[in-house]
A protein has these predicted regions:
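Short, well-ordered amphipathic alpha-helical segments that serve as non-catalytic structural scaffolds
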Residues: 76-94, 120, 198, 256-271, ...
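Condensing-enzyme catalytic core mediating Claisen C-C bond formation in acyl metabolism
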Residues: 1-75, 180-259, 263, 348, ...
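Acidic-glycine-rich active-site phosphate/pyrophosphate-binding loop
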Residues: 115-130, 169-180, 233-238, 292-306
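Claisen-condensing/thiolase-fold acyl-transfer catalytic domains that form or cleave C-C bonds
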Residues: 112-114, 131-133, 138-159, 258, ...
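Active-site glycine-rich loop that binds ribose-phosphate moieties when present
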Residues: 139, 149-153, 170-196
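Short beta-strand segments
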Residues: 6-8, 110, 140, 165-172, ...
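Short acidic, glycine/serine/threonine-rich loops at helix termini
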Residues: 15-16, 118-122, 149-152, 177-182, ...
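Conserved beta-ketoacyl condensing-enzyme motif
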Residues: 46-62, 66-130, 136-137, 141, ...
């Protein structure tokens, strides 16, 4: 059992609305598709209003080497991770006083949009006053499922060490993977969806001292479930080229969600003798409008139970693994909470895979 006590976030400064993003896509792809106007409707109909990027949109019109893009990834990810962690450990909405860095026993660092060895959390520990004995657990390659998986693995750590405080950092700079020479439909659709963002969550075990928490009710993680769909590597992921990360993005993802997810959720709920009616809220990774629609149709949920996911999609688009932490933060600050009510945290990612967490609202301090 583990509690989510706080979430901090950090966004790049370059805010791009969908109209401007569609103009960019037209410039980049107009000579590659005869039906470009139809394809560009994805920008208008995707329920995304704006996204944030680490570079001005004009920068992405030119080719950049993988070396250049990855160096930017390291620098910007470190900067935004630092800001997200600082906010997470001292957010006035969540704490009466800041949590000392040396209290953090382990750091899970999650990403899939760049490479760094030593990994980013090691660089972060050189810039912030963490204990040198802090355990480092980098997780790479889970894509959009990574944030939920990071929460699940951190909760398992807290179960083993119930007095521990643990950080989960999810950092994704999706825009740096854009390849202007890639004129595929997958790249165009990806251009309509993905944005950049970093988030950090603080979890603690049941026996940790939570007296500084301001939360009247906090999510207490009860259990998690990981599921892999076999022989589905081609649904989403990366091809690695001389230019960097080339997106793999199947158009069948919403259909797969609709057909595959319900059974997995049902098995998870059955394990705890629960039904869909017992779930008050679904804090889901909003992969896109069609994915949210598939959640609603497949699980028979009301749109209201996915309101935080829809809100984050509108404001920031799909930030891969970081997105789910933004969704949880939105609900912590703005959502309805009632003691002992249960909810789900969920995300889907490369594999093709599903990560689910069951939680209940319990007294935070």
């Amino acid at each position: 059992m583990a509690f989510i006590l706080s979430i901090g976030t950090s966004l790049p400064v370059y805010d791009v609305n969908q109209e401007k993003a569609a103009e960019f896509a037209r410039y980049m792809f107009q000579h590659s598709f005869k039906d470009i106007d139809r394809l560009l409707s994805a920008f208008k109909n995707g329920q995304i209003h704006s996204r944030q990027f680490v570079k001005p949109i004009e920068w992405y019109k030119e080719e950049h080497s993988f070396e250049e893009k990855n160096q930017i990834y390291i620098e910007e990810t470190l900067k935004h991770s630092r800001e997200a962690v600082r906010e997470c450990l001292s957010h006035p909405d969540f704490f009466q006083e800041a949590i000392p860095y040396e209290k953090v026993e382990a750091v899970f660092f999650v990403s899939s949009t760049g490479l760094s060895t030593p990994s980013i959390e090691a660089r972060l520990m050189n810039e912030l006053p963490f204990s040198p004995y802090t355990k480092r657990i980098p997780i790479w390659g889970l894509g959009c499922a990574g944030g939920a998986s990071g929460l699940a693995r951190a909760a398992e750590y807290c179960k083993a060490y119930p007095e521990a405080f643990v950080l989960v950092i999810a950092a994704e700079l999706c825009s740096l993977t854009f390849q202007p020479e890639d004129k595929t439909k997958s790249n165009l659709i990806g251009t309509s969806l993905f944005g950049d963002g970093v988030a950090a969550a603080l979890l603690c075990g049941e026996k940790a001292d939570r007296r500084v928490s301001k939360l009247k009710l906090a999510p207490k993680i009860i259990d998690s479930q990981s599921v892999l769909m076999k022989q589905s590597e081609d649904v989403m992921g990366w091809d690695f080229t001389d230019q960097g990360f080339k997106v793999i993005f199947s158009r069948d993802i919403p259909t797969l969600v609709e057909k595959w997810l319900k059974t997995n959720v049902q098995i998870f709920l059955d394990k705890h003798q629960l039904s869909f009616r017992d779930i008050s809220v679904f804090l889901a990774h909003p992969g896109g409008k069609k994915v949210i629609d598939a959640y609603i149709k497949s699980l028979g949920l009301s749109s209201e139970k996915l309101s935080s996911a829809q809100s984050i999609l509108r404001k920031h688009g799909n930030m891969s693994s970081a997105t789910i932490l933004y969704v949880v933060k939105d609900h912590l600050q703005n959502g309805n909470k009632k003691e002992a009510e249960r909810g789900l945290i969920g995300a889907l990612g490369p594999g093709f895979s599903s990560e689910l967490l069951l939680f209940s609202w319990e007294k935070g301090a």
